Amino acid sequence: MSNAPFLSEVSKRRTFAIISHPDAGKTTITEKVLLFGRAIQTAGTVKGRGSSQHAKSDWMEMEKERGISVTTSVMQFPYNDCLVNLLDTPGHEDFSEDTYRTLTAVDSCLMVIDAAKGVEDRTRKLMEVTRLRDTPIVTFMNKLDRDIRDPMELLDEVESELNIACAPVSWPIGCGKEFKGVYHIHRDETILYSTGQGHTIQEQRIIKGLDNPDLDAEVGADLAEQLREELELVLGASHEFDQEMFLKGELTPVFFGTALGNFGVDHMLDGLTDWAPAPLPRQANERAVEATEDKFTGFVFKIQANMDPKHRDRIAFMRIVSGTYTQGMKMNHVRLGKQVNISDAVTFMAGDRSRAEAAYAGDIIGLHNHGTIQIGDTFTQGESLKFSGIPNFAPELFRRIRLRDPLKQKQLLKGLVQLSEEGAVQVFRPLQNNDLIVGAVGVLQFDVVVARLKSEYNVEAIYESVNVATARWVECGDAKKLDEFQRKNQTNLALDGGDNLTYIAPTMVNLNLAKERFPEVEFRATREH
């Protein structure tokens, strides 16, 4: 059998996530990207069936109420000659752990920056995570229909704060009420902006060349002159686009536009599909796995509960690393050492699920999970592999969780363990008492847990403050030393949702003392799934 059709499918795939600070316009960009992919016909409206008002990529109840993307959705759409898998990551301040893990499942990222504000805190944190794997980054400077900071300043800030070289591909002409469009440096043409076209794909009005008198006539002599002067400076001072540096994560192409006005998004998508890598090889503990291998491999990076409230189901999101998924195929669930038959995997269009007939390396599929699949699990066509680099992060905030009705302890524990398996929260059970301590990376996670315990497990829970500053996973190669450590630190030890031994420190001083007293013991701030 010829391998050509399979290789052509894999080479078409582009799998990326959007990273940004909350409110930089990520959900709007997602909508406009889908519009260009013709996945939806009018934007504003990334809306599923049955709702006329909610953006389609935000679909849990709480997200609808608060207007934030709390869970990671996956959307697939065609663009140019590629098939794009877009992973939407939670944009809200709090939802970082899920976001970090999603970044392990993509081959490139789109960084969205609010051009009025520049580099913000959350963007820095997310960039640090992409650095762990040198992920290629494309940058979109958003909100040019508002008054923005000086574009040169923005480039300098990205370079100095995020430690990545910038190569502008387009350049803005004016901003706010004066925003006229962008000049595309690589194509030597000006694309003019029309207002009020945000919900549809704009008919492009293009002026060829920088010295074309039509440019002065359209944007006004002053702005045209300003553009020529700025470009002279920019082209002299900034980097040219370099594919090799981009693929190493050392340089980012920069596009300017307004997602709300649906302008410039297509230039960015053109760049992304032209330059971003097709599915990359991935490191397993045993060896590196190439996307073009014909045997299937994949790993689970996220578990999402109740995507369909009518069915209490959980979906495990799997990134296919190599080979092809076909309906009804047998897979080896490596952690359990068990052969499973997968006949009902799903593909995604944010909340609209359809059964996958076939999927290829680079694609994300959903497996129905009845409690046997965990984050980090590897599935193969026989080989015993474990993909590495899907981390759990030590929580930064802690609360004790308590029941209003003490008879529901069993349901509470079941609910918390399931929520911790899907990464919504981490749960710790101290060895010395029956407390249940919940750990999160952001405050909003606590609200989500209580809301979901109520709607999914019919358990009413409340929080109390607890004297915990931080948690560390404990490991020690010397069984005798570990035993001594456990005897002397009973009051500070707990088991997490996966029964891993954890040190719960009331203060950072306490943690540092414990480290000094037991140098043989490792206190880890992250744990691989």
UniProtKB/Swiss-Prot annotation:
Primary localisation category: cytoplasm
Database matches in PROSITE patterns: G_TR_1, G_TR_2
Stretches assigned to the tr-type G domain: 11-280
Superkingdom of this protein's organism: Bacteria
GO molecular function, one term: translation release factor activity, codon specific
Gene Ontology biological process terms, A to Z: regulation of translational termination
KW Protein biosynthesis (keyword) present: yes
Binding site for GTP: 20-27, 88-92, 142-145
Keyword Protease annotated: no
InterPro entries: EF-G-like_DII, EFG_III/V, G_TR_CS, P-loop_NTPase, PrfC, RF3_C, RF3_dom_3_sf, RF3_GTP-bd
Keywords assigned by UniProt, alphabetized: Cytoplasm, GTP-binding, Nucleotide-binding, Protein biosynthesis
One Pfam assignment: EF-G_D2
Cellular localisation: Cytoplasm
Record HAMAP family: Rel_fac_3
Protein's job: Increases the formation of ribosomal termination complexes and stimulates activities of RF-1 and RF-2. It binds guanine nucleotides and has strong preference for UGA stop codons. It may interact directly with the ribosome. The stimulation of RF-1 and RF-2 is significantly reduced by GTP and GDP, but not by GMP.
PANTHER family recorded: PEPTIDE CHAIN RELEASE FACTOR RF3
Protein name (record): Peptide chain release factor 3
Organism: Vibrio vulnificus (strain CMCP6)
